[in-house]
């Protein structure tokens, strides 16, 4: 490292510059005539002898450092100032289109962030689909949350934590457990749930020391979290470390522009601010702050003048506008079959689960590194996607459920932010016309759910919903969700590193135990719990061998599962082993087909059968008694005869290399030597190195001949078995039958056939008995 003197800095002038400036000022003073009048007292002037001494002092360090500068690789140009030049270029580009230069740091920071994260020209797209790396981001603080992006995510609803929250329900994990046949959660209305219970409940028992702690807290205030006898370890530690009464719930409201228009057109006229310069007017002469529909008009529409009925109708309308329509829009968006499929696919990337894990293994590409925001795809290799694998049982279920809850929150907030930004004045004027036209129909609706559905048709039309569904959800890593979780906890006054709280701990699990302002969060929590079980993320269904990437969900099983789809398994075994050439055309252009890992992975990720996808219920393939509705086929080569022929060609080529080939043959996939003897041939006896080469070759040929005979007597293993109990070298895929197709198999591929017979041959060499090996070695002695 370079040693910088304390008085020097990157922006301060150096000592030679100071001396040069002083010399220039002294030379300029010599040009002034002696009789010129002095206009200003310059104060003390340095005598010539003292000034020469000053220059001598400044010259000594330069002479001492002259030797160092000759050997310094940074001495040419202002290398250390290059980062300042780059950053100044970015700032200059940010303010180039502005008529005035910003004078405050806040304004400049806002312009700087918008230029970086929300540029006018979208980033260039690379060949792999991700946007190119932006070197301009190097100068933005790494762990800072940019305000230009967080347009909707920074808003919260500070609300009192109900005593009926999930953290105060010791049997919450048991109550949230779902089994086969469970349906997607729905929504409710205030008419259906007129009474709310926010208490602790009769089934919950306080811990032994909870009463003593409560007496101590009476002087400081009661916490909403109460220690219970059935609390798990995480909640017990959480309740002892923090005392909270309120929580910052992320805002999930409809766009403020829309809600302001709805309130102004359906409920109460918005009051305009008072102009001080205007003359005072009679408040009765204006409609500001008055109901949109008067009692006389409502009596005429309903055909009754009963004050109680009129009051109930106003309550119904208020509940529909403030609570139920938000739930209705949210339920329409998330309950769509296409949206549910896309959400579950993104969750498979987030947790590196099921078919995504299988694709990563075969393609040798970490697909879970892909993240996106508002349709722009990025590759981030710093994210983590296997953190959930370190947890077990209830801790894993709580973490997975909370991650999906945050994922749904982020998705909804992103959509609401886009909706809010796209609305213009002309759109709001058209919305006001539609609301005014449907005023009578809304006020005379059948019930609260009917009014909310009709209002949702107006403010959340199908065209808007489809547009948002096409761009959402985004790919997110567990690291992004963890940062989002920490951001929420910090806004709630909780230090994430000192407490083990999850945002879903403060949400009730039932609508009847949740205050209506938090019903949207209750719905998202219940939906997250459903998606966790529907995607088979709550438990680890994987195993060994073919079961390594197994997942029971409808996206993976049976069509994307190597265990259930034998055609897909056969196709995966011939990846990179053949090349098909088509006939030459008139332009001497030949079309070739090679089944590369990339081509197969792309087709594998796109493989989806909507007929066997049950979005609104948990209906796993293993729980069904009927076969799948769509046939089980491969991804690229969908004809079984072609796959069987490719397997036969592959086996014939491998047998030829093993029996008649000369030289050293390497497997193109693993690099293994195909026609050399097993390492046991060379290491079984210390005297084998003195055996003549011809006798060694004869022994190896005899070994291969015996192994080929043994291979015909070994069958495949049980489905999902690791293979440890059926011969040492059977491997993960099981064994085949000496290159010949078994009865009932597809083109010699067998349902549980191994990757190749030559791997079995190499493995069988290691499984020879000690007696036979010793006899062969003793015969080879000179």
UniProtKB/Swiss-Prot annotation:
PTM annotation (Phosphotyrosine): residues: 349, 665
Alphabetical GO biological process terms: intracellular transport of viral protein in host cell; symbiont-mediated suppression of host gene expression; symbiont-mediated suppression of host translation initiation; viral translational shunt
Domain RRM: 332-450
Location within or outside the cell: Host cytoplasm
Keyword Chaperone: yes
Lineage: superkingdom: Viruses
Note: All late proteins expressed from the major late promoter are produced by alternative splicing and alternative polyadenylation of the same gene giving rise to non-overlapping ORFs. A leader sequence is present in the N-terminus of all these mRNAs and is recognized by the viral shutoff protein to provide expression although conventional translation via ribosome scanning from the cap has been shut off in the host cell.
Assembly, per entry: Monomer. Interacts with hexon protein; this interaction allows chaperoning and trimerization of hexon proteins. Interacts (via N-terminus) with host initiation factor EIF4G (via C-terminus). Interacts (via RRM domain) with viral mRNAs that contain the tripartite leader; this interaction allows ribosome shunting and expression of viral late mRNAs.
Job of this protein: Protein that inhibits host translation while promoting late viral translation by ribosome shunting. Blocks host cap-dependent translation by binding to eIF4G, displacing MKNK1 from cap initiation complexes and preventing EIF4E phosphorylation. Binds to the tripartite leader sequence of viral late mRNAs and recruits host eIF4G, PABPC1/poly-A binding protein and 40S ribosomes subunits on viral mRNAs, allowing ribosome shunting and efficient translation of late viral mRNAs even though conventional translation via ribosome scanning from the cap has been shut off in the host cell.
Protein name, per record: Shutoff protein
The organism of origin for this protein: Human adenovirus A serotype 12
Source organism phylogeny: Viruses, Varidnaviria, Bamfordvirae, Preplasmiviricota, Tectiliviricetes
């Amino acid at each position: 490292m370079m040693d910088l003197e304390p008085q020097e800095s990157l922006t301060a002038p150096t000592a030679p510059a100071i001396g040069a400036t002083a010399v220039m000022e002294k030379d300029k003073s010599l040009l002034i005539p002696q009789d010129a009048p002095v206009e200003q007292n310059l104060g003390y002037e340095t005598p010539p002898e003292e000034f020469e001494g000053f220059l001598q002092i400044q010259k000594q360090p330069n002479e001492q450092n002259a030797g160092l500068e000759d050997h310094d690789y940074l001495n040419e140009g202002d290398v250390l100032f290059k980062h300042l030049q780059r950053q100044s270029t970015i700032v200059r580009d940010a303010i180039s289109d502005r008529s005035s230069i910003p004078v405050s740091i806040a304004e400049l920071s806002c312009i700087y962030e918008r230029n970086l994260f929300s540029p006018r020209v979208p980033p260039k797209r690379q060949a792999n689909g991700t946007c190119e790396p932006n070197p301009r981001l190097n100068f933005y603080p790494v762990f800072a949350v940019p305000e230009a992006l967080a347009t909707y995510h920074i808003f919260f609803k500070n609300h009192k934590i109900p005593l009926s929250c999930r953290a105060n329900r010791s049997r919450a994990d048991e109550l949230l457990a779902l089994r086969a046949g469970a349906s997607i959660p729905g929504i409710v209305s205030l008419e259906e749930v007129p009474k709310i219970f926010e208490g602790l409940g009769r089934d919950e028992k306080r811990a032994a020391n909870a009463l003593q702690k409560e007496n101590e807290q009476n002087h400081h205030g009661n916490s909403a979290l109460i220690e219970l006898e059935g609390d798990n370890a995480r909640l017990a530690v959480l309740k002892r470390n923090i005392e909270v009464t309120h929580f910052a719930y992320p805002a999930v409201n409809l766009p403020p522009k829309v809600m302001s228009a709805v309130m102004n057109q359906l409920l109460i006229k918005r009051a305009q601010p008072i102009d001080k310069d205007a003359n005072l007017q009679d408040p009765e002469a204006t409609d500001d702050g008055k109901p949109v529909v008067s009692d006389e008009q409502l009596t005429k529409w309903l055909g009754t003048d009963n004050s109680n009925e009129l009051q109930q109708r106003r309550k119904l309308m208020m509940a529909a506008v403030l609570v139920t329509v938000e739930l209705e829009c949210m339920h329409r968006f998330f309950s769509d079959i296409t949206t549910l499929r896309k959400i579950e696919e993104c969750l498979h990337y987030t947790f590196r689960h099921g078919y995504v894990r299988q694709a990563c293994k075969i393609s040798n590409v970490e697909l879970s590194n892909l993240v996106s925001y508002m349709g722009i795809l990025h590759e981030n290799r710093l994210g983590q996607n296997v953190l959930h694998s370190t947890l077990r049982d209830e801790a894993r279920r709580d973490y997975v459920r909370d991650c999906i809850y945050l994922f749904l929150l982020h998705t909804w907030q992103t959509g609401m932010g886009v909706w809010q930004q796209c609305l213009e004045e002309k759109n709001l004027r058209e919305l006001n016309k539609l609301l005014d036209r449907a005023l009578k129909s809304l006020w005379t609706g059948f019930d609260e759910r009917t009014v909310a559905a009709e209002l949702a048709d107006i403010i959340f039309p199908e065209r808007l919903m489809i547009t948002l569904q096409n761009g959402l959800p985004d790919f997110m890593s567990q690291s992004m969700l963890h940062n989002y979780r920490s951001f929420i906890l910090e806004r709630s006054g909780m230090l994430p590193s000192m407490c083990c709280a999850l945002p879903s701990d403060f949400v009730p699990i039932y609508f009847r135990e949740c205050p209506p302002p938090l019903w949207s969060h209750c719905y998202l929590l219940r939906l997250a719990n459903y998606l966790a079980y529907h995607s088979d993320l709550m438990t680890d269904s994987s195993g060994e061998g073919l079961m390594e990437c197994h997942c029971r969900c409808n996206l993976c099983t049976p069509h994307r599962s190597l265990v259930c789809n034998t055609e897909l398994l056969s196709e995966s075994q011939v990846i990179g082993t053949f090349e098909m050439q088509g006939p030459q055309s008139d332009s001497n252009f030949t079309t070739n087909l090679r089944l590369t890992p990339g081509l197969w992975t792309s087709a594998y990720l796109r493989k989806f059968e909507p007929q066997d996808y049950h979005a609104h219920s948990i209906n796993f393939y293993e729980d069904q008694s009927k076969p799948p509705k769509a046939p089980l086929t491969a991804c690229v080569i969908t004809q079984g005869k072609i796959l069987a022929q490719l397997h036969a060609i592959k086996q014939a080529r491998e047998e030829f290399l093993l029996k008649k080939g000369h030289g050293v043959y390497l497997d193109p996939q693993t690099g293994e030597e195909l026609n050399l003897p097993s390492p046991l041939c060379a290491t079984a006896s210390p005297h084998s190195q003195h055996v003549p080469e011809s006798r060694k070759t004869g022994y190896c040929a005899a070994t291969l001949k015996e192994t080929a005979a043994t291979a015909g007597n070994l069958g495949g293993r049980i489905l999902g078995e690791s293979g440890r109990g059926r011969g040492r070298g059977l491997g993960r895929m099981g064994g085949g039958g000496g290159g010949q197709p078994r009865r009932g198999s597809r083109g010699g591929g067998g349902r549980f056939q191994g990757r190749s017979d030559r791997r079995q041959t190499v493995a069988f060499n290691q499984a020879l008995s000690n007696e036979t090996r010793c006899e062969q070695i003793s015969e080879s002695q000179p």
